[in-house]
């Protein structure tokens, strides 16, 4: 093989802090830490839309949510999926001679129950069998499901609607399948691109093998000073039913799942080395978004705090130097970055900015930033907006994450939601507990600059949120 291979591993709902080498959460990840020590460790990788489907759409297309149309998750009751005409990284790699493979969670297809109460595939709830063809967007080898969170009893589809049911923790099983694929790839001259998306540590948190749970049975709390266990809720006003003890156990299980992923990642690295593929394979380890785990009284994702938007990213192997990359890398930046690292053409459709140069040099990139985006997507939130004649894509929040600041313009999720502008200084206030609240961006020079960047982006993307920037915020 003369061309470089790609192994792209990403977990669901895994925050940047939850890795030993990050020096924050008390999580055990020796294999990941060792990989980071000889690779390029990205300090500011960011999920631009911290939700599964929207991030994945940007990841594969190199485009922002306004362009992909992915304003929420693919879910029952909504006709939302990755459009057939989108040009994805899998298609680009296939057209340039790569064998392409996808093993694990997809979550870019529409649930089958939107069209049939009893799908032939047996898919239920949010799940779907994605048949061979354009909806796989260039991936030839397919061992996947749309979305289902039964981590200990997963199922998959290949090229028929007959599901493959498994009694094994999903990351372990998917790693088994990936290693078999690598063994086959080692015997071929053709370069490969293998994408391996693990679902854990996504909730339900307790679906994790007992040997990993035992690692954290004596863990003391709180693990972060901004955790508020008394008023837990989600990004909507919906309250969580978790007690403080529930949160403690969920956090233990969350870390346990990450330690389990660490073991599986080590198995992958060992296989690459044993098969003689390690020196010619770029390996990327990352996630689609993080998890609040009680910080600011919040659970899950879909908010602008670092626990939600901050994702791990380590890039190593095949000519990638050891070091630290300080560039703020957003969701849409990943595809053009990978293509440039592999010396492949970047389609004109891709809107993200390649970080290949910074990954190869370890540049600090003090002036780098990415855009942030979120819309209301739950059916209970969409109905009042529809009744009021309001486009849900004009609501939610938009923002900028730069090296030092996170700047947010929040219009809320309801027709009568108050506007707010928030500026977080991540150097002075890393736990984001004391934002500067502004009526207008002009009240603060830093906010004025960042809102200028935001306005240019919203105008370029024809985002219906843009007129909100002309309104004065009412929350102080």
Predicted regions, residues:
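Formylglycine-dependent sulfatase
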Residues: 1-410, 415-419, 431-456, 463-476
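Residues forming the ATP-binding cleft of Hanks-type serine/threonine protein kinase domains
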Residues: 427
């Amino acid at each position: 093989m003369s061309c470089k291979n790609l192994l792209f591993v990403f977990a669901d709902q895994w925050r940047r802090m939850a890795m030993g080498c990050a020096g924050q959460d008390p999580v055990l990840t020796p294999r990941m830490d060792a990989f980071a020590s000889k690779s390029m460790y990205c300090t500011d990788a960011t999920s631009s839309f911290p939700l599964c489907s929207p991030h994945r759409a940007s990841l594969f297309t190199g485009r922002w949510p306004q362009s992909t149309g992915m304003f929420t998750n693919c879910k029952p009751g909504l006709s939302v999926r990755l459009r057939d005409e989108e040009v994805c990284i899998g298609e680009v790699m296939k057209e340039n001679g790569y064998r392409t493979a996808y093993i694990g969670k997809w979550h870019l297809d529409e649930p089958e129950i939107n069209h049939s109460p009893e799908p032939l595939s047996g898919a239920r709830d949010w799940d779907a069998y994605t048949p061979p063809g354009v909806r796989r967007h260039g991936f030839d080898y397919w061992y996947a499901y749309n979305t289902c969170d039964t981590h200990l009893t997963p199922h998959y589809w290949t090229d028929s609607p007959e599901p493959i049911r498994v009694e094994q923790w999903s990351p372990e099983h998917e790693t088994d399948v990936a290693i078999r694929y690598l063994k086959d790839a080692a015997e071929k001259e053709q370069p490969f691109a293998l994408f391996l998306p693990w679902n854990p540590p996504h909730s339900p948190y307790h679906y994790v093998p007992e040997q990993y749970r035992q690692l954290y049975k004596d863990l003391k709390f709180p693990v972060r000073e901004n955790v508020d266990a008394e008023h837990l809720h989600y990004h909507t006003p919906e309250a969580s039913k978790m007690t403080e003890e529930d949160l403690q156990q969920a956090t233990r299980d969350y870390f346990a799942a990450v330690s389990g992923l660490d073991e599986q990642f080590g198995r992958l690295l060992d296989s690459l080395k044993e098969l003689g593929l390690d020196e010619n394979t770029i390996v990327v380890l990352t996630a689609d978004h993080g998890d609040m785990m009680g910080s600011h009284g919040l659970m899950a994702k879909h908010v602008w705090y670092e626990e939600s938007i901050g994702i791990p990213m380590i890039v190593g192997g095949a000519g990638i130097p050891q070091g630290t990359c300080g560039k703020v890398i957003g969701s849409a930046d990943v595809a053009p970055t990978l293509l440039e690292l592999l010396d492949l053409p970047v389609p004109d459709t891709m809107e993200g900015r390649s970080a290949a140069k910074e990954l190869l040099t370890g540049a600090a990139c003090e002036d780098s930033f990415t855009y942030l985006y979120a819309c209301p997507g739950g059916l209970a939130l969409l109905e009042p907006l529809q009744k009021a004649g309001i486009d849900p894509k004009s609501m939610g929040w938009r923002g900028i994450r730069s090296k030092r600041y996170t700047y947010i313009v929040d219009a809320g999720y309801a027709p009568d939601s108050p506007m707010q502008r928030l500026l977080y200084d991540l150097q002075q206030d890393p736990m984001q507990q004391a934002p500067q609240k502004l009526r207008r961006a002009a009240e603060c020079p830093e906010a004025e600059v960042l809102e200028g960047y935001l306005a240019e982006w919203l105008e370029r993307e024809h985002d219906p949120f843009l007129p909100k920037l002309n309104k004065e915020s009412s929350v102080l």
